[in-house]
Amino acid sequence: MDPTLKELLHANLEWIFVGGKGGVGKTTTSCALATLFATTPISDAASPGGTRPRRVLLISTDPAHNLSDAFNQRFGPHPTPVKGLEESLAAMEVDPKNFTHGALMSSLTGAKSDGSASSLSAEAEADAAQHTASFARIGAVLKEAARTMPGIDEISVFAEILHYVRTLFYDLLIFDTAPTGHTLRLLALPQTLSSTFDKLMSLEGLAPMIEAASHLIGTNLGALGGACGDTAGSCEQATAAPSLSSAAPGEGSAAAASSQSRWCITADEVRSTALHWRQTMEEVQARFNDPNRTSFVCVCIAEFLSVYETERLVQELMKYNIGCDSIVVNQLVLKPSSEPPCRMCSARQKIQAKYLEQIDLLYEDFHVVKMPLLSDEVRGVPALKKFARFLQEPYSPDTHGYIDVQEPC
């Protein structure tokens, strides 16, 4: 097999995941790969010259983000153009806090009046404030639990995947993933969530129970705007309604209806939402399993633990039916033959040669890219471009010599 990633470059993929053991150069590889794709135009008959820049979005799913360090540029939870490649490459770092601080969780920390609460009596306002404070405390507990919940990193990343699953703006999404364990949980989420939804929705009476619970919440929070009333034909009178008798007829009713409508959920809405999520997850799963749309690039170094974990990762990817036929072996000690021997280099080369032989035997039907150990850090677009060159062209120490990725001072 060709020892480069040129096949990926011309495969018209939509998603590429880059993963492996921690500390093997996943971020450098994913950033270089994103730079390579962003600088390779794609065919477009509607564009001048028949080509246009490929629009690439690089997403870091690792809780310990490094994209900002690799590009010497600060990124956040939203796509930000990469300096020097503004037309073709954007990057973002998924933050689980954004997921736990979303609209749903924020609403639980206390609903605010829209101004109509001024028509309430002092007693009603006090009662409404008491109900709101109670739910605010519950919401605070739920938010804290969500922030510390095991798996929240994977769920927040999956939420971003769902967000971009139907977008047509980007031609390619590249995921700089977390170490192997996190990544495997992320890739298993579509199957896990689909199975969970099926089991939950098969429970008789679950949707009516959710509907009843939402009505209870709506009844209490409805006190902010007045009596809850029968806005949806099923909500009962709020317990705080007797204290509103002093208000003029109809005052606060519009606010009450608006307040409760935010919280009352019907059984049909529950089923419809569950079905929508189920269909979206099936679409994500279909993309994961389509080798023409999704590919996984494994990154490792020529050492026992890394090679062992790479084999485990490849086996798990096969289990989930996710295409993977590319492996990047980083940090190889490769010296020109004219260089005098070095005791330390020779020792490292001996160890690496042992594991490179195993890699060649295990993955003879893979594209195995062998990348050299560099004397400088790979930081910034110019350095990443130099590094990316050898993802599509085999590196030879005798031909290319040492690679200086940083500009001389």
Curated annotation (Swiss-Prot):
GO BP of this protein: tail-anchored membrane protein insertion into ER membrane
TM annotation in the entry: none
Positions bound to Zn(2+): 342, 345
Keywords: ATP-binding, Cytoplasm, Endoplasmic reticulum, Hydrolase, Metal-binding, Nucleotide-binding, Transport, Zinc
Gene Ontology cellular-component annotations: GET complex
Residues involved in ATP binding: 21-28, 303, 330
EC number assigned by the record: 3.6.-.-
DNA-binding in keyword set: no
Compartments, record wording: Cytoplasm; Endoplasmic reticulum
GO molecular function: ATP binding; ATP hydrolysis activity; metal ion binding
Record-linked CDD domains: ArsA (cd02035)
Domain of life: Eukaryota
InterPro entries the UniProt entry points to: Anion-transp_ATPase-like_dom (IPR025723), ATPase_ArsA/GET3 (IPR016300), ATPase_ArsA/GET3_euk (IPR027542), P-loop_NTPase (IPR027417)
Active site: 62
Xref: SUPFAM superfamilies: P-loop containing nucleoside triphosphate hydrolases
Keyword Nucleotide-binding appears in the UniProt entry: yes
Cystine pairs: none
Subunit structure as annotated in this protein's UniProt entry: Homodimer.
Family stated for the protein in its record: Belongs to the arsA ATPase family.
Role noted for this protein: ATPase required for the post-translational delivery of tail-anchored (TA) proteins to the endoplasmic reticulum. Recognizes and selectively binds the transmembrane domain of TA proteins in the cytosol. This complex then targets to the endoplasmic reticulum by membrane-bound receptors, where the tail-anchored protein is released for insertion. This process is regulated by ATP binding and hydrolysis. ATP binding drives the homodimer towards the closed dimer state, facilitating recognition of newly synthesized TA membrane proteins. ATP hydrolysis is required for insertion.
Protein name (record): ATPase ASNA1 homolog
Species of provenance: Leishmania major
